[in-house]
Curated annotation (Swiss-Prot):
Residues 100-165, 529-550, 563-584 are annotated as: Disordered. It holds the Pfam family eIF-3_zeta. This is Eukaryotic translation initiation factor 3 subunit D. mRNA cap-binding component of the eukaryotic translation initiation factor 3 (eIF-3) complex, which is involved in protein synthesis of a specialized repertoire of mRNAs and, together with other initiation factors, stimulates binding of mRNA and methionyl-tRNAi to the 40S ribosome. The eIF-3 complex specifically targets and initiates translation of a subset of mRNAs involved in cell proliferation. In the eIF-3 complex, eif3d specifically recognizes and binds the 7-methylguanosine cap of a subset of mRNAs. Belongs to the eIF-3 subunit D family. GO terms for molecular function: mRNA cap binding; translation initiation factor activity. Residues 563-575 have a biased composition (Low complexity). It is found in: Cytoplasm. The gene is eIF3-S7. Keywords: Cytoplasm, Initiation factor, Protein biosynthesis, RNA-binding.
Length: 584
């Protein structure tokens, strides 16, 4: 008899776990005993537990991206391998050079299978070792040059030089416009016709062709020419005052126009005062400024550094370059009472009745240009000499001088070694270091309508003596051809000038100032009070209560050291101050 088994199903129960309530934050309040005193360290299975010495790799690696793809796990020191030196196992190793067999004497033939020089498609001139490409020393050097860095400054480039503005901006000046160089470089005003002559003044001497045969082996000393150069601004020009009644509505000089047209190449700060009177613009330079001084190595990668009263400070180099240009432009002429001269219709307007001394050979050509939209520009341009051609016609010259001061400091080619054989390399170096100055000279020659632009190569007789110079050679160009060589676009130059004129024409009558920012590639237009820069008398400070600021923004005083001043006074041409200008 079988027993009946009754299976009564039991009811499933659920017991809720005991939860801890953390009043101070989140997470458990107590740590279980099983997990106490266990250190936590981020860990990844792909991490290496130690460092392996790779004796087949090269020491020259690309350190910049060494940690780009490295994992942050396993960064603790408990997993790293530390090698402890054991003095008992120390022994000397024979380091004598082993002569390789002939078939392994190539550059990378020791392990051609693993080391491949990257010269094919997609290669970058490196060496592939164990699947990792490392840059060679030459490739690293080329990379640094492309990035503009050097090892001298720790791969960060030289520290930026902070320059001061050419004039102190006062709080009551109102900024009207900021024009950055990339935007100005895109402007263009094509189809501007050749300037039309309104009046010609002055007397010119003829160029001495014997200076075309000067070379390094037949150098000539630069002589001191005691002549007066007039640097008259726009509103002080009696001819422009007369022409402003009948011709044009914008007035300037060739130097002022060239500064504005070539502003995108400039690094130093400069400023130009613009007066708007009755719908007419007068562009002026300020009195007692260094506007007329020539910059030296302004656009070089390492421009001259300020070093007190050193001969190679920016201000002293500018003074030296200016006097070299004055003396050179007069020495290469056929001067003398018996020598013929080329006279224009009117005499020099800046020679006063009580003026003592001989005036430099400079002729002035007053010209006008139609810039469309009712804008007519009237400007005073200059010629330096004339040249009689074999065909009988006369050509007008613009004469300038390039000066060498210290080729080692300037990182330039030494002229005495390369001028006769590699003149193109020297000129290319000058174009790189003095791009703004050469562009302004070219613009001035084009505005004046000069037939030739003649350059002289003048160097110091001794590197440490700025008082004696020698002429090493000359070179001439047609202004338009030279403009094409230096990538100077007159359409862009006219466009920059027209842009600034249009902005000023929209303003009310008053005084304005356009200034190149000393540390940024841009120019600013300010609305300034009418009495700014006015002076009660000669030698006094303006009503702003401060003396003029130097053009380059350095702290050098207006007077140089005693030896520099004495040296310059012995070799320089006489340059009168603004107070010596002839009155209208």
């Amino acid at each position: 008899m079988s027993d009946t088994i009754s299976c009564t199903p039991e009811t499933a129960t659920f017991e809720a776990p005991q939860l801890q309530f953390n009043e101070d934050g989140w997470g458990p309040c107590e740590l279980p005993d099983a997990f106490k005193d266990i250190p936590y360290q981020p860990f990844s299975k792909s991490d290496r537990l130690g460092k392996i010495s790779d004796w087949t790799g090269t020491a020259q690696t690309d350190k910049k991206f060494s940690n780009k793809y490295a994992s942050q796990f396993g960064g603790g020191s408990q997993y790293a391998y530390f090698h402890e030196e054991d003095e008992t196992t120390f022994h000397l190793v024979d380091s004598a050079r082993i002569q390789k067999p002939p078939h392994q004497r190539g550059r990378f033939r020791g392990n051609m299978r693993n080391n491949r020089s990257g010269r094919g498609r997609g290669a970058r001139g490196g060496v592939q070792v164990g699947g990792m490409t490392t840059l060679s020393k030459s490739a690293n050097k080329m990379r640094d040059q492309r990035r503009g860095t050097t090892r001298k400054w720790g791969m960060r480039g030289p520290p930026p030089k902070i320059r001061d503005a050419s004039v102190t901006v006062r709080p009551d000046w109102v900024t009207i416009e900021e024009m950055d160089f990339p935007r100005l470089a895109k402007l263009s005003l094509p189809s501007v016709k050749e300037g039309e002559d309104i009046m010609t003044c002055g007397t010119l001497e003829y160029y001495d062709k014997t200076y075309d045969r000067v070379n390094v082996k037949n150098e000539r000393p630069l002589q001191s020419v005691d002549r007066i150069f007039h640097t008259v601004t726009t509103t002080d020009d009696p001819i422009i005052r007369q022409l402003s009644k009948t011709h044009g509505n914008v007035y300037a000089t060739d130097a002022i126009l060239a500064t504005i047209m070539c502003c995108t190449r400039s690094n130093y700060s400069w400023d130009i005062v613009i007066d708007k009177i009755g719908g007419k613009l007068f562009m002026d330079k300020r009195d007692n400024t260094e506007f007329d001084l020539l910059t030296v190595n302004e656009t070089a990668s390492e421009p001259p550094q300020e070093d007190g009263n050193s001969l190679n400070s920016p201000r002293n180099l500018a003074i030296e370059a200016t006097f070299i240009n004055h003396n050179f432009s007069q020495q290469v002429l056929k001067s003398g009472e018996k020598e013929p001269k080329y006279k224009f219709q009117q005499p020099n307007p800046f020679i006063g009745d009580d003026e003592d001394g001989e005036v430099a050979s400079v002729a002035y050509r007053y010209r006008k240009w139609d810039l469309n939209n009712g804008i007519t520009l009237v400007a005073r341009c200059e010629h330096d000499a004339v040249l009689k051609m074999p065909q009988g016609d006369t050509q007008f010259l613009t004469i300038k001088a390039l000066n060498e001061w210290d080729s080692k400091i300037a990182n330039a080619v030494e002229w005495r070694q390369k001028l006769d054989t590699q003149r193109g390399a020297i000129l290319a170096n000058e174009l790189r270091n003095n791009s703004c100055k050469l562009a302004k000279w070219t613009v001035q020659a084009l505005l004046a309508g000069s037939d030739q632009l003649k350059f002289g190569y003048v160097s110091r007789a001794h590197v440490r003596d700025s008082s004696k110079h020698v002429i090493l050679g000359t070179q001439q160009f047609k202004p338009q051809e030279f403009a094409n060589q230096i990538n100077l676009s007159m359409d862009n130059a006219w466009g920059i000038l027209r842009c600034i004129i249009d902005i000023c024409m929209k303003q009310k009558d008053g005084k304005y100032l356009i200034m190149k920012d000393p540390n940024k590639p841009m120019v600013r237009l300010y609305d300034i009070p009418d009495n700014t820069f006015d002076s009660d008398g000669e030698g006094e400070e303006g009503d702003d209560g401060e003396a003029f600021q130097p053009m380059y923004g350095y702290s050098a005083a207006a007077s140089t050291s005693a030896n520099v001043t004495a040296a310059q006074s012995n070799t320089s041409a006489t340059v009168p101050d603004q107070s010596e200008k002839a009155s209208a």
